[in-house]
Amino acid sequence: MALFRKLFYRKPPDGLLEICDRVFVFDCCFSTDSWEEENYKVYMAGVVNQLQEHFPEASSLVFNFREVGTRSVMADVLSEHGLTIMDYPRHYEGCSLLPVEVMHHFLRSSESWLSLGPNNLLLMHCESGAWPVLAFMLAALLIYRKQYSGESKTLDMIYKQAPRELLRLFSPLNPIPSQLRYLQYVSRRNLVSEWPPLDRALTMDCVILRFIPDVSGQGGFRPMFRIYGQDPFFVDDKKPKLLYTTPKKGKHLRVYKQAECELVKIDINCHVQGDIVIECLSLNDDMEREVMMFRVVFNTAFIRSNILMLNRDEVDTLWHIKEFPKGFRVELLFSDMDAASSVDLMNFSSLEEKDGLPIEVFSKVHEFFNQVDWVDQTDATRNMFQQLAIANAVQEGLDGNSSPRLQGLSPKSIHDIMKHAAIENSAKFKLSSMSEVETIDTPEKPPTDSVKKFIAEDVHSVLQINNQEQNASEDATKLLHQESPSLKLVHHSATVKPLVDDSKSPENAEENFPKSPSAHDGKAISFSPPTPSPPHPVRPQLAQAGAPPPPPPLPAAASKPSEQLQHSVVQATEPLSQGNSWMSLAGSTFQTVPNEKNLITLPPTPPLASTSHASPEPSSKTTNSLLLSPQASPATPTNPSKTVSVDFFGAATSPHLGASDNVASNLGQPARSPPPISNSDKKPALPRPPPPPPPPPMQHSTVTKVPPPPPPAPPAPPTPIVHTSSPPPPPPPPPPPAPPTPQSNGISAMKSSPPAPPAPPRLPTHSASPPPPTAPPPPPLGQTRAPSAPPPPPPKLGTKLSPSGPNVPPTPALPTGPLSSGKGRMLRVNLKNSPAKKLKPYHWLKLTRAVNGSLWAETQMSSEASKAPDIDMTELESLFSASAPEQAGKSRLDSSRGPKPEKVQLIEHRRAYNCEIMLSKVKVPLQDLTNSVLNLEESALDADQVENLIKFCPTREEMELLKGYTGDKDKLGKCELFFLEMMKVPRVETKLRVFSFKMQFTSQISELRNSLGVVNSAAEQVKNSEKFKRIMQTILSLGNALNQGTARGAAVGFKLDSLPKLSETRARNNRMTLMHYLCKILAEKIPEVLDFTKELSSLEPATKIQLKFLAEEMQAINKGLEKVVQELSLSENDGPISHNFNKILKEFLHYAEAEVRSLASLYSGVGRNVDGLILYFGEDPAKCPFEQVVSTLLNFVRLFNRAHEENGKQLEAEAKKNAAEKEKPKTGGLDTEIKKPLNEEVKEEKTKTSGLGKEMSDRLKERTAP
């Protein structure tokens, strides 16, 4: 079919460029030259005449994009030739795109016209400055007809047809991000039952900017927002209006610094519906000059979860702007209009001395805390004025955003008005007048029957101009000019609504077109108002940012020189009838085959020998895959759609050929290509000592007859080299002839060594005696030679192996025969049992010299050698062999015959090895694995396994390599088979990511909801705690008592940073702090507030949460949901393989959207409560983050509890002390009473004792007297 089209392809006439089948663009649209009116008429007439000669049976329909209200010279020329013209606006509120309803009208009109007959042609034309809109609409048409896929690729392909600077000349801002957003609306139309969907009326709550840019050059900016769109309160009026602008009065405009705030939240509270344009500008210090920061265009019908998150690549910015940081992000938070709530504002009256203690309570506080500085050395009066200014700014924000027409209306009455207006709008399904369509008579040539039918049908859906609404719009415009003199806006009353109904089949398309009345013969249909709208200059920020457009190619009237700068907008209205049925040509096969000169064929694969000298270390597995690739990878044909683009547009770039790149990349790896086995390549890889005698011819013939190596089998274990060494002083004895068996093994190993380099080959036995080595490891294989004696004939075979010697990794040689006196004498080996296979190594630390007097020096003596027992090698082999004996014998047999292929490895060895490890952990058959992915079965796999599968998805190069393999698939490795199985699933990596998102969605939603609930609960608890409020009021009274008579006194509030200073301010005796005194006063006066911490239970868990991480989680969920929507749209075209996948994913999407919408509402509400909490303490939400607030409050709670406990302990200690002091007087009186009788008794005893002594002395005297 492609060859047939190529043979019968007809070059389009001069002056036209063919975009796709039967769709042409005038080449004057790609030029910036100015045309004289007469020259332009001659040029256009010549193009039309050539077109009619080229396609004599064809009927043409022209779509023209121009400035509304201006004269079109092209319409005058084309109408003379009987061509039908349909005019569309050139922009929407200065943006290079059109509303969704106008897009739908254009797409259905184009599709219906092309489906009416094979001879119908579609011509596209744009006047000066409208090229960006024309390119956008052409890309939408190609995606709508499913001729191209991929929004970015299609749009870029269209823009390449014109010089690149043309887009920047006509658009000072880069419109591509918003255009791609609207193209996604078109490509994903199959996800909704009705397209375009009904408009949603939403309330834009706020705009959050993260990582703010530096626009002013001083580390910050002063943002200002303007919002344009349809007013949802006036459903019948679809003209775009200025819905919101940031007031320039008061404190609404403030400067945000990057060093002060990472996040900026600006409350909007604006009702929006339909196509919305949001402009963010930065106002200079003079409050006059505006600089455009970015612009966002979207439709509210496609806001699925009431939140729109955009990064710096998804907003329209000035060309080459560099002020935006990498992490810049815009978050637009919405809510349903009936569920919108305002931001909780701070009420400064709550900080008055109402419920707190009066100031008289602290009359004695001066004697404790006089001359103590516990407040920052700043002006307290200035702080108070800043707090009052914040309150005024908040109040003015509410007053500035209120609409005058809504004053006095309750929310319920507003909702009833909107509901009633929506019912009336749905009933008004017909336009009021058909006489206001701008037409141009062409009496020369009547149109064809198909044109008459198309005109008669399309008249019901063209742009209508309602003259009765013009006065009302002019009054509204004057009112807007009076409100904001700096804004110069023009609101046109032009409206449009598509005519098409998708309910009827293409077969009835011809019957559904009614006969055209003769009054419409030769008339052109215009989508612009008959009277030009009043001109207005370009917005100042756009005029300054971009270069002025060049003179238009079409001449304009001399009396209206400024009409070229008008930005008029045409908006859609309701259709006239629903009885129309136009064909849908989705999946059309109209394609054109490129010429032979544009076809790119794959070059022939170069011979393998051309890369054989690149590296001395080959890889047999990779060599095998390369040997198979010339036969298994033929030239891959180019994609028809890609070659069409080359032929149609003459682009200098060629289609990408994955197969060619793959072959080139493989052949460009010299380390993976072994040298071919030929006479010319038999050179030694390293220089050698004196060469041996020339080898016999038998060896030469043996080597040259080796065929190209197939995939290798396990190589045979090498025969250890036997060294019969002697001490260095005596000369070496003559070498004996080598045994015949090792010789034959050496020959066989030499034959098999080139194709099997991974293992060392078997070498012949050397009987030469080298001197003692000076290094621990022995020389590498292939380089083992006797330097002190010429090599005997058997080593000639061994030296012949030197060309492949470097390819063999160096391994230590194991001795196998009886050794003479010297090193290693303790090892006595029976020569009959010399090992025939490799043994397991003993990893010891080898000594190279025996120190005199050591064990090993004594071992070198002959008398000690007999003490070591003989080693039975048979038993040693049976116990410590590296492989089974039968396997070793089989390996020797296989090596003598040549390696046999076992597994073909096409994927890089390390990646294949890691992939097999991953598959061993999955433990699911490959067939069941793909079925689990397509059926989204969470029972078969867990989240970690799915993440591992994503890491090992085949790349494009690996897919091309596997597609080119034509051998036996049973010989492929496990990794290759896994890749082949995964390749059966279209876009397997995207499906796995969607699967992973689905598996983790419930847990992510639950965790984020819990975290948001903790933050919300903490904010509510702090604001609603009456006990905490009375404590804060008491602190205010305490501070005013301390600062009475100073500049810090008479405060109405204090900042949160003042709370920690309660513990830092100490009394004169240093035994008490202000926090202790506060607890003491509260315990004495209002003890019921001391347990306020029980009301703040969520405060501590809230300190462990950062709002930044919550925002990132919310963005990840939204991005994942977007990927689900995108994959669901693409998988609709996969066929039966994705049928069950689509069904399950649609159910999940319906559930996930409801969950995300609910979560977004909670996210928005938490943001409002957080701001309300910060404002509750008189702080600025832009400078005082939530984390700082809760951490300060938690610290205050802990210090308060500690001080209260210390006060309790102090009171207990004082009570014990007082009790002890009271017990002291009683104890002293008891002691005196006890001591008094004791003294009397002592005296009596003394008296008695003295009396007895006197009596005894008298008796003695009497006896002794003579």
UniProtKB/Swiss-Prot annotation:
The answer on whether this UniProt entry bears the keyword Hydrolase reads: yes
Q: Where is the composition biased (Pro residues)?
A: 529-538, 686-698, 706-742, 754-781, 806-815
**Which PROSITE patterns does the record associate with it?**
C2_TENSIN (PS51182), FH2 (PS51444), PPASE_TENSIN (PS51181)
Bias type Polar residues, positions:
617-644
Pfam families, alphabetized = FH2, PTEN_C2
Report if keyword Signal is assigned.
Answer: no
Q: Where is the Phosphatase tensin-type domain?
A: 9-193
- Write out the catalytic residues in the record: C126 (phosphocysteine intermediate)
Membrane-spanning regions, if any? Answer: none
Q: Which UniProt keywords apply?
A: Hydrolase, Protein phosphatase
Gene Ontology terms, MF aspect: phosphoprotein phosphatase activity
Q: What spans are recorded as compositionally biased (Basic and acidic residues)?
A: 889-902, 1210-1248, 1255-1266
Please list the residue ranges annotated as the FH2 domain.
Answer: 829-1226
| Gene3D superfamilies with a match to the protein in the record | 2.60.40.1110, Formin, FH2 domain, Protein tyrosine phosphatase superfamily
Q: Which InterPro entries does the entry mention?
A: C2_domain_sf, FH2_Formin, FH2_Formin_sf, Formin_homology_domain, Prot-tyrosine_phosphatase-like, Tensin_C2-dom
Q: Which domain of life is it from?
A: Eukaryota
> Could you say which protein family the record assigns here?
Belongs to the formin-like family. Class-II subfamily.
Protein name, please? Formin-like protein 13
